[in-house]
Amino acid sequence: MSQTLKSQDTNMSDSGYRDPVEDSQNVLGNDPSVNSQAQDPIVTPSNTVEAQTLHPTSDLKEDHHEIGAKGQEHADTGDRAESSEEPALEKPPLDKAELERSPSSQDTEQRHHPYSEHVGGDTLVLDPNYSQSDLGGRADAHLESSSAAPTEGAGEGGEAGAHLESSCAALPVGADEGGRANAHLESSSAAPTEGAGEGGEADVHLESSSAVPPEEAHLESSSAAPSEGAGEGGEADAHLESSSAAPSEGAGEGGETAQNLLAVDSTDAQSPCHSSAGPGSQDSLRRRLPVTEAERHEEETQLVTEKEEVAQETLRKTEKKSLWTYGSMFLGCLIVAVVLSSVNSYYSSPAQQVPQNPALEAFLAQFSQLREKFPGQSAFLWQRGRKFLQKHLNASNPSEPATVIFTAAREGKETLKCLSYHVANAYTSSQKVTAVSIDGAERALQDSDTVKLLVDLELSYGFENGHKAAVVHHFESLPAGSTLIFYKYCDHENAAFKDVALVLTVLLEEETLEASVSPRETEEKVRDLLWAKFTDSGTPSSFSHMDSDKLSGLWSRISHLVLPVQPVKNIEERGCLL
C-alpha cells in the first residue's frame, strides 16, 4: 500500500503538479470572491479537527499508564473506540465519489486500531478499554484516517487533521527488548469534487512508534482519484519521518499547524511520562503491604516481649523488696524475742533475783496498820513518813541516819507520844526488838553534861545491841547543852550509826494545831520554839553551852522531815497502850 501511494505521488509530480496547497493558497489569495466563500468552510472543519485532535490529547494523559496490557484485546477495543469516536467527528456531506470510496475506507479503518499513535518509544492508546497487554499481541500499530473532500465552493482553506501522540523516552513496563521505531506520516488527499476551488485538503499525521522491538507503524489513507472539474488544487502528500523534524515542501500552513500541535502535545506528553510510574509504585506498595504488616506484627511482638520483660523485672524487684522488707521485719521480731527472753530469764532466774529486804517488808506491814489506829491524820504524814523511812531502809549503805520530827499542840500530847513510839517500833520490827526510848521531860532539871552523857550511853548501847530505832520524847525539854550530843548521831557524814532511825517529838506551847496547817508552817513553828528554849543571852558562851550558831548546825542535821500530828480523842482519854 505504501509503495502504491508513493508511485501515485511520483506520477502526480511528473504530470506537472507542484504543491497543491501552495498553489491553492496563491490563487485563492488573489481571488476575493473565493476568499469570502472560504471563510465559512474553514471555521467548521477547523473546529472539528481541533475537537478530533484535542480530545485524544486529553485521553492521552489519562490512559498513558494502560500501555502494555493484553495483546489479544487490541483489535476489538480498537473497533469499539472507533465506533465511539465517529459520532463526535463532524464531517461535511460526502459526494458520490466519496460514498463509493467510503466502504473500502471504512473496511481499511476497521482493520487498524483507531486513535493509536506511537511517539518516541511508548505506545499510547486512547481507548479506555484498551489494556497494556495488547502491545504484546500486535507487532505493528496502524493509524489510518480518511480525509473527506471539501464541498463545492470551498476555498483555499483545507482541513488539517493533526493527530499527535507523544510518549516518554523511557521504555514502557514489560518491554523486554529495546529498539527504535521509525515514524511514517503518510497521507493522501481526497480528490476535489466538482466546483471545488484551488484549495486542497492536507492531513498531517504524526505517528511515533514505541520502544517495542523494531517494528514500524504506518499511517495509511486512501485517496480517491480527482474527479472532473478539479481546479488547480491538487493532493498534498506529506511524509514525515521521525528522523526529519521539518515538514516537507508544500506543507504550507498545514505543516506549520502540525508543527505547532507537535510542540504543544510533546510538552503536554511529558506529564504522563512521570505519572507512568504510578501503577508501578502502587503495585510496589501493594507488594510491600504484607512486609509492612509483618514488620508491624514483629514490632508488636517485640513490644509485647519488652513489656513482659519489664513486668518480670518489676516483679523480681518487688519480690526482692518484699523479701528484704519481710526478712528485715522477721529478723527484727526475732531479735526482740531474743532480747525479751534474755531479760525475762535474767529477772526470773533465782540466782539473779534481788534479795528481799525483810526490814522493809516488816516496816511496810506495820506502818500500814497505823492508819487504822491513828485516824484523822493528814495524808501528808502517811505519805511522806512512809516514803522517807522506806528509802532509808532500801539503802544498803546509808550515809546518815533517818531523822524525823513529829510535833503537836497541847491537846494532842498523848497522841504525839503514842504515834512516835509506834512508828519507831515499825521501823525496827524486823529485828524483833523495841525502839530505844528517852524522855526529855524527866531530865529537864538535871545537869546538862550529865544528861548529855546519859543520852549518849543509852543510844549507843541500844544501837549496838540491835535496836535500829530510838525515840526521844519532849526534845524541847532537854537541857540546851545536852542536845549537842546529837551532832554525833545525826551528822551528814560522820554519824556514829548510819543505818538507824531517830524519831524526835516536839510539843508546841499552842493549845491546838489546825489540821490545815502546811508542812512549811509546821517546820517554822518547831524552829521558833527551839530557838526560844536553847538560846539564852544570859548564859555564858562556852564549849558545853548552846548558842545560835550551834543550834543552826544542829537544826540542819535533825530537820529533814517535820510532820504535824492531830489529836485522837480515844488516845487522849485512855492514853497510849504500848
From Swiss-Prot:
Q: Where is this region: Interaction with TOR1A?
A: 344-578
For whether the record's keyword set contains S-adenosyl-L-methionine, the answer is: no
> What is the membrane topology listed in the Swiss-Prot or TrEMBL record?
Single-pass membrane protein
> In the record, which positions carry Phosphoserine?
24, 104, 131, 271
Where does the protein end up? Endoplasmic reticulum membrane; Nucleus envelope
Disulfide cysteine pairs (residue numbers)? none
- Positions carrying Phosphothreonine are 301
Alphabetized, the UniProt keywords read: Endoplasmic reticulum, Glycoprotein, Membrane, Nucleus, Phosphoprotein, Transmembrane, Transmembrane helix
* Cellular component, GO annotation: endoplasmic reticulum; endoplasmic reticulum membrane; membrane; nuclear envelope
Residues the record marks as carrying a glycan: 394
What GO MF annotations does this protein's record show? ATPase activator activity; ATPase binding
Q: Name one Pfam family in it.
A: LAP1_C
Span-the-membrane segments of this chain are: 326-343
Ranges per topology, Cytoplasmic: 1-325
Q: From the UniProt entry, list the residue stretches annotated as the region Disordered.
A: 1-255, 267-287
Q: Where do Polar residues bias regions lie?
A: 1-14, 23-56, 267-283
Protein role: Required for endoplasmic reticulum integrity. Regulates the distribution of TOR1A between the endoplasmic reticulum and the nuclear envelope as well as induces TOR1A, TOR1B and TOR3A ATPase activity.
Concerning its family, UniProt says: Belongs to the TOR1AIP family.
Q: Quaternary structure? A: Interacts with TOR1A and TOR1B (ATP-bound).
Q: Which PANTHER family match?
A: TORSIN-1A-INTERACTING PROTEIN, TORSIN-1A-INTERACTING PROTEIN 2
UniProt protein name = Torsin-1A-interacting protein 2
Organism whose genome encodes this protein = Rattus norvegicus
